Amino acid sequence: MPDKVGYWLDLCDEDMATAKWLLRGKRLLHMAFYCHQIAEKSLKAVIAQKTGEAPPKIHDLIKLAAKSDVYGRLSEERLSFLEELGPFDIEARYPDYKAKIEETLTVEKCERILEETEGFMHWIKIRLGR
């Protein structure tokens, strides 16, 4: 049986490397999108471990956290952070929203987002025993 949890975590590691590369190149909107992806895939790893099945094909981080066993364990700061990441997924793909979102991003803000994303991913890996 394939390691479904490992599959999602491997994707997280690949996306983290990409997010760091994008930040170095000051591709801030794309970096923020990848941070959303990392959080999403981290939560999907938890769901895969919990259910033994493929996670739902949704992108809402709060809904994914609720379907996992981590929602009740999220600090207010982490919950707020997941909410902050929300707009970087779907909205970042549409031209009408891209410019508005891009205006809110600075290198300093993106450095913080990347750091918090890495911390969240690490926290999930610890919870999963990885």
Task: Report residues per predicted region.
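Terminal alpha-helical segments
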Residues: 1-130
